Every structure is written in C-alpha cells, then in structure tokens.
Amino acid sequence: MFKKTFLALLLSIGFGSNNFKYSYTVITTNEEINIDGNLDELVWKTGTPISNFSQKDPQPGEPARQKTEVRVAIDNEYIYVGAYLFDNSPDSIAKQILRKDGWGYSDWFAIGLDSYYDKRTCFGFHVSPSGSMRDMLHYNDTDTDDSWDAIWESKSVINNDGWSTEMKIPLSQLRYNPSEEEQRWGLNFYRRTARYGEESFWAPIFMESKGFVSQFGILKGIILPKQNRRIEVLPYISSTD
C-alpha cells in the first residue's frame, strides 16, 4: 500500500513539473529570414536547439524514434520557428498534400503557444512535409476549436536525412499582455510520424493527467512593449521541394 501511494505521489509531482523542467529562451533577431524551409540563416545556428521528444503514443514516455531539433526566434513583428525532423528512412515520410486544416495520412510538426501564460489557452500551428498547414485554438486546457484561422507562413523541404520546415507567425495573430519587462509564455512542440502511428511532444503529455496546455514547458526571454495589430493578408499555398 505504501509503495503504491509513494508512486502515485511521484507521478503527481511529475505531471505538474513540465513548466520547470522544460524551458527555452527565445532568440532575439534582426536578421531577415527567408521562409523557404532550408534553415540556412545564422539564427538557426544560434544556441542549443530543443530536442529529446517523448512519445505520447504508442509507447507513452519512451523517447521518440526519430530525432527532432527546433529553434524559436522573435523580432518586433513575428515569431519564427525553424525545425529539422530527422528521418532515417526519408522515402517513407508521409507527405499527402492536403487542403488547409486537413489532417489525412501525413507526418506533422507543430508548435503550441500559450501566449497569455494562463495554462489554459494555446494557439497551435501545424505544418506537414508537403507544406500543408493547420491551425487551431485550444481553450479550457483541453478543448479545441478547429475553426480558428490565423494568417501565417510556412515552407517545408524534404532532404536525404529527413525534412525541415520554417514558420513565420505574426505577433498580431496572437493574444498576449504587452510589457516592458521580460515575460514567459507556455510552449510545446508536437511531431507525428504516421508510419509508426507515433505522436511525440517536447514537454511530455501524460495521459494520466487531465490537462493539456497546463503540461506545457516555458518560452522565456520575451519582451514585447506593445501589441502589434497590423492586418496581414496572405494566400494559402501548399508546397514542398
């Protein structure tokens, strides 16, 4: 009985500790980033990338089968994401071309941003190897609104050892509290490898926990004195090289 109680206590502590253990400091940049999926800008060689994803399915808690490296940068108008999704069998990458907000049989990479840092609300941005895009709003920690649409850019490239992607997300598409002082946002990354039926996250999502956004890690180093409300109008184009 004591053993079971002690184990339950350890697990409950673990479920609430992601936002302390998993943290990343955003890269502040003035570099012009060309969204072509190639990760050849200097910013994508800065600092240590996020890695070490853990499976949610099919083997919860086990390391993801394929390596992922991610960096996040920011300027006065945009959040940028550069990710390399290694794959030792690139010919097996699932890359079905889909309409915007489609799902289908495809590999995926996503970022989740809790820009209010309320541990209940998250803006999600997904991209596939074919360049297909999805966006959604998570609210009440676990609920999802797939009808939410943002204006943002991405491009993916399939290489001989995996695929890479770049995202450019206008700050005007997010909701946050402007401040002259450094603020923190909730952060997580997701990868789906379709042929394995595998879903993995940077900050682990424990099935035993009732929450989703509340299990995110932390994005640090953000200073945004004012909220950008510039209107963005961009066409949706699904493409890959």
Identify what each model region corresponds to:
Residues K4-I13:
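Sec-dependent N-terminal signal peptides
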